[in-house]
């Protein structure tokens, strides 16, 4: 009798155990199905990413090139965005199988020199005449701001974050313009879009260029793309304190040590055309009112001494004040 009762009592226990095992099996199966779905989603995303990268790469294959290297160059009076993007985009083109070399129009400023030194990157060669060369423009699309001979150059591409300029070509070109804070941000996006790994040195100079052109993300032109680019590039570059890096490079931007008045006036100088009027403007920044006032006096004399060297109807010098990157005038 006791054995019979024991058998009867054990039946529910066996059923419970069976149900638990069955439920566990169902749960495992569902987990496996979910994991499989997740993997399929990841595989699809990776395939889509690879497809987009392949399509982006194919989009530049129709560049009409003449014999010789591609010179990647920015505007006259080169700032950090112009210098650093020329270097970074030339490296990108080389990684994509093209022969490219960065160039500048004239000597770089203290800030750009500081960024390149920190990254361990050499200053690009100066290009005296662009006539007849394969040219890829960065950070501008204006003949008035371009290197000498640009109107007779073979322009194959433009990467810019300004308005549409006067540069025109009869052949197909790579043209990319975005309304964001720095051309360097566009170049960063191109590395991602083309699936090219960003080396530490390139990440370092792109980081410096974005910080410079957006005034550490305080400029009105700053976008979410610029904000996302900074931590991404800083991690690769090994820059732990972005704000400290900006303060250091900004101090260099406000330094005119060892420069003549003519060099100061034309350090950040650009020319524009409005209708039939062509004018030029040199932009300067000072850290305080005393320095700004002294610079203003010097630039007034510099305009009188050197203004006639430029082929413009009007020429200006604008002296502003900035403290730790913040405009205070």
Q: At which residue positions do the language-model features occur?
A:
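Hydrophobic helical h-region of N-terminal Sec-dependent signal peptides
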Residues: 15-20
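Bacterial lipoprotein signal-peptidase II cleavage site
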Residues: 27-33
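C-terminal motif of bacterial Sec signal peptides marking the signal peptidase cleavage site
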Residues: 22-25
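Bacterial N-terminal signal peptides that target proteins for export
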Residues: 2-13
């Amino acid at each position: 009798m006791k054995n019979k009762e024991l058998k009867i009592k054990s039946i529910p226990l066996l059923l419970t155990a069976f149900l638990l095992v069955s439920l566990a099996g169902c749960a495992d199966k569902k987990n496996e199905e979910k994991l499989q779905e997740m993997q399929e989603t990841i595989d699809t995303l990776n395939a889509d990413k690879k497809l987009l990268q392949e399509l982006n790469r194919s989009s530049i294959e129709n560049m009409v090139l003449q014999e010789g290297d591609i010179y990647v160059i920015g505007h006259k009076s080169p700032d950090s965005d112009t210098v650093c993007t020329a270097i970074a985009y030339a490296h990108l083109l080389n990684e994509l199988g093209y022969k490219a070399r960065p160039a500048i129009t004239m000597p770089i400023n203290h800030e750009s020199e500081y960024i390149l030194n920190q990254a361990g990157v050499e200053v690009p060669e100066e290009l005296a005449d662009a006539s007849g060369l394969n040219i890829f423009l960065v950070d501008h699309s204006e003949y008035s701001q371009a290197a000498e001979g640009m109107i007779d150059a073979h322009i194959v591409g433009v990467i810019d974050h300004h308005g549409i300029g006067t540069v025109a070509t009869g052949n197909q070109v790579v043209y990319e313009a975005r309304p964001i804070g720095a051309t360097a941000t566009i170049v960063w996006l191109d590395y991602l879009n083309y699936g090219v790994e960003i080396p530490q040195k390139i990440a370092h100079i792109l980081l410096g260029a974005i910080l410079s052109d957006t005034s550490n993300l305080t400029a009105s032109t700053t976008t979410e793309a610029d904000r996302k680019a900074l931590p991404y590039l800083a991690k690769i570059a090994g820059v732990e304190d972005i704000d400290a890096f900006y303060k250091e490079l900004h101090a260099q931007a406000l330094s005119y040590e060892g420069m003549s008045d003519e060099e100061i006036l034309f350090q950040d100088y650009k020319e524009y055309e409005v209708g039939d009027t062509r004018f030029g403007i040199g932009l300067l920044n000072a850290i305080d009112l005393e320095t700004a006032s002294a610079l203003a006096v010097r630039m007034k004399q510099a305009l009188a001494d050197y203004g006639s060297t430029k082929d413009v109807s009007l020429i200006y010098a604008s002296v502003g004040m900035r403290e730790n990157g913040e405009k205070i005038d």
